[in-house]
Regions:
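Extreme N-terminal starter segment of soluble prokaryotic enzymes
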Residues: 1-5
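CN hydrolase (nitrilase-like) catalytic-core segments centered on the catalytic cysteine
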Residues: 63-83, 152-235
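Active-site catalytic loop in hydrolytic enzyme cores
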Residues: 90-163, 176-184, 188, 247, ...
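Short polar catalytic/cofactor-binding loops
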Residues: 7-13
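Short, acidic/polar
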Residues: 17-26, 153-158
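Cys-nucleophile CN-hydrolase/nitrilase-fold catalytic domain and related Cys-dependent amidase chemistry
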Residues: 15, 23-105, 175-195
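C-terminal beta-strand edge segments of enzyme domains
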Residues: 135, 202-273
Length: 273
């Protein structure tokens, strides 16, 4: 399976310009016969909720919105699965989620969304935390999604793996001050679950926030297969070998050697793993 990691900078609050960039990169990816392309956290609007402020609601979208319509059309015309971060409008007035949507060919709207579960810093003031851990069946594989700070919580990645994901995508807006933590977390989640992890970090600045890039595909042994540059935009293409992933799970049996007779992870839908 061939994937593309779209490491981009965004214009804060300018959805039109950001969507135009996303559209252009989707077209480039399709020309390279990519199966899945992933964009960073909040790619359509920029990241900083405190800078967007009360405009968050106006920038938010739900089923059938501008982002959903455009990416559905692109997915269908390009035969491309698209994962993209955006501000999702909730059912209650003023409720917004830091979400990543997924679009697959032959559907008129997004397949679904993952709403960021672990909010950090000022995100907690503006966004509502997610409550669900969905998986998404695409034409090529079963996809799990986490967003940025979610990668620091082993339980989430473990549940995604145990539910049957083939790969985890991690749209992010990670700051350069914590670059070392990013590297360790991404490799650890991949290795301990025997799963490929595609981490897509944005670049650029928003006032005092500096996003460092460094998007990467990590294999099931926790090794980096492809690494984007630091600090500038880049579209990188990667091959994912699920046969190698299966081989790794046989050689490094962390999932099979869990002692569920003495411990478990309980997900609030009452399924235990």
């Amino acid at each position: 399976m061939k994937i593309a990691l779209a490491q981009i900078d965004t214009v804060l609050g300018n959805k039109r310009k950001n969507l135009l960039k996303i559209e252009n990169l989707c077209s480039k990816a399709a020309k390279e016969n990519v199966d899945i392309i992933c964009f960073p956290e909040l790619s359509t609007t920029g990241y900083s909720p405190e800078l967007l402020g009360s405009n968050l609601w106006n920038l938010s979208e739900s089923f059938g919105g501008k982002t959903d319509t455009l990416l559905s059309e692109l997915s269908n015309s390009l035969k491309l699965t698209i994962i993209c971060g955006f501000i999702e409008r909730g059912k209650i007035s003023g409720e917004v989620f830091n979400s990543a949507g997924i679009w697959i060919p032959h559907k008129k709207h997004f397949l679904g969304t993952f709403q960021k579960i672990h909010l950090i810093n000022n995100e907690r003031i503006w966004f509502t935390q997610g409550m669900h851990i969905p998986l998404f069946d695409t034409p090529k594989c079963r996809v799990g999604i986490m967003i940025c700070h979610d990668v620091g919580f082993p339980e989430l990645a473990r549940i995604i793996a145990l539910k049957g994901a083939d790969i985890i995508f991690l749209p992010s807006a990670w700051h350069k001050e914590a670059k070392d933590i990013w590297t360790i977390n991404c490799a650890s989640r991949a290795l301990e679950n025997g799963i490929h992890l595609a981490a897509v970090n944005r670049c650029g600045k928003e006032e005092n926030l500096h996003f460092f890039g460094g998007s990467q595909l990590i294999d099931a042994r926790g090794q980096t297969l492809k690494l984007a540059n630091y600090n500038s935009e880049e579209l990188i293409f990667c091959e994912v070998d699920f046969n190698e992933q299966l081989k790794t799970r046989l050689e490094i049996p962390y999932l099979r050697h869990r002692r569920t007779d003495i411990y478990s992870i309980e997900y609030t839908d009452k399924n235990e793993y």
